[in-house]
């Protein structure tokens, strides 16, 4: 029996099917080529590279701009400071207090003493500002000489001709007092004895500090007792409060250890 097919009844469908198959075969290489072009790593890398290089190029420009702005900003304060900083003129006011000027005048003198007129002459000679600006600075010099304990008045000898007394530096001020570089004022550095007293007071209390002479740490005042108040309202002089016994006496070995440590300092001070 012969085979029967639907294509025998409709030959037109066969021709259309053949045409569709041929068209499908002809378009398949183009699709493959496009897919290979899209999936080709070289082309994708090139596109990303161009994008990345463009991005890096833009970023480098931004960096250069930022660096230029930073350099300008960093240079601007220095340039402004250089423009603001003008060379100091000798006629400008010196950055020293009157006490510092007096101290410099006395120290620079050959005999380490000067009269009031000699101090004036030193200041006017070394600092022309006071020569041209006479606005009461001489009165300030006199007041500082009389009020500051660093300066001592020394009477003139009978065989020394001239007028006025001499002014010298106190013996303790020569080593302990100095001129501050930042403020231009007199500063007092702590002596070895005062440092030792303060160290003893901080570590062991007032009892250990009293071992050093001329040291009286501030003691809190005791409350006033009722019997100290008179009936008529007259308040007698308050009694000196007795300091509480520090804990250092409860440990004699601790106090003895501290005294042994300070023995070398005691020998130097004697």
Curated annotation (Swiss-Prot):
Query: Where the record puts its DNA-binding region(s)?
Result: 93-188
* Annotated SMART domains: FH
Biological process (GO) annotations?
Answer: anatomical structure morphogenesis; cell differentiation; dendrite development; embryo development ending in birth or egg hatching; nematode larval development; neuron fate specification; non-motile cilium assembly; positive regulation of transcription by RNA polymerase II
GO MF terms listed in the record are: DNA-binding transcription factor activity; DNA-binding transcription factor activity, RNA polymerase II-specific; RNA polymerase II cis-regulatory region sequence-specific DNA binding
Keyword set includes Kinase = no
Q: Cellular location of this protein?
A: Nucleus
Q: Summarize the protein's role.
A: Transcription factor. Plays a role in embryogenesis and later development, perhaps acting redundantly with forkhead protein pes-1.
* Protein name as it appears in the record: Forkhead box protein fkh-2
Which species is this UniProt entry from? Caenorhabditis elegans
Instruction: Kindly list the organism's lineage.
Output: Eukaryota, Metazoa, Ecdysozoa, Nematoda, Chromadorea
